[in-house]
Design a protein with these regions (language model features):
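Gly/Pro-enriched, hydrophobic low-complexity segments
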Residues: 135-219
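An acidic-aromatic
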Residues: 72-124, 187
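Bacterial N-terminal signal peptides that target proteins for export
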Residues: 3-18
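Boundary at the C-terminal end of the N-terminal hydrophobic targeting segment
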Residues: 30-34
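Bacterial N-terminal signal peptides
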Residues: 16-27
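Extracytoplasmic
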Residues: 49-51, 70-72, 80, 90, ...
Length: 220
């Protein structure tokens, strides 16, 4: 049987303490990239961004129902705060955000919901987060985990607990993001075919609702 001497215990525990301390002194890195590097790269890309469009695949996991729903469509953003995204498939709908107003148009039901948009509404309009990632330092606390940038809102943001960003080394710096809310529901958004600064007009973000559509207004 090997007898562990007091000096050996001290050496081992001392080494562990040194390694833990050393890890805290190092900047947070993933493959040589620090949190600050990633944030700087994203915010620099946003400085030159006027508009953006592309495709998305959204997977929403609802914990209580143990169900995952998948949606596909297109999104369009004109900074600072004009958005349009179109869900394709059986239940088509279009969502418009223009500054502090949101309109959700459901084609099949021939109805539209109109309401206010603010920080508390982000959880219901996840693609809108893309318009705000140019202000990461102001809006979020950031860290790195498993190669992803983890963002936690500094102020309440519609029940959002954290956002995981998968960054891209080419073109637009955000490849996908995951939103976790207070109920541990999870929303994954994967972006593709992204084009930037194509000259989207402001009028594109104003819905042209056909006659006969019922408009339901909600004010918070």
């Amino acid at each position: 049987m090997h007898t562990v001497m007091p000096g050996e215990i001290f050496r081992k525990s001392g080494l562990c303490f040194f390694l833990v301390l050393f890890s805290f002194l190092l900047p947070v890195t993933v493959q040589g990239v620090t949190v600050d590097d990633e944030i700087t790269r994203i915010q620099q890309a946003y400085e030159n961004l006027q508009d953006i469009k592309g495709n998305f695949v959204q997977k929403s996991y609802i914990k209580d129902l143990k169900r995952t729903d998948t949606f596909k469509g297109q999104f369009f953003i004109k900074r600072p705060m004009m958005l349009k995204w179109c869900y394709r498939g059986e239940n088509e709908q279009e969502v418009f955000i223009k500054n502090d107003e949101i309109i959700i148009y459901q084609k099949k039901e021939k109805q539209a919901f109109k309401g206010n948009f603010n920080r508390e509404t982000y959880g219901q309009a996840p693609i809108a987060l893309l318009s705000g990632f140019g202000r990461i330092r102001e809006e979020f606390s950031a860290s790195m985990k498993n190669g992803k940038l983890i963002l936690k809102p500094k102020k309440a943001m519609g029940g959002i607990v954290s956002i995981e960003l998968q960054t891209s080394g080419k073109g637009f710096p955000i490849q996908s993001f995951t939103v976790i809310d207070l109920l541990n529901n999870r929303l994954d958004m994967v972006l593709s075919d992204i084009q930037i600064n194509t000259g989207l007009k402001e009028s594109f973000f104003s819905p042209a609702l056909p006659k006969g559509v019922t408009i339901l207004e909600h004010s918070s």
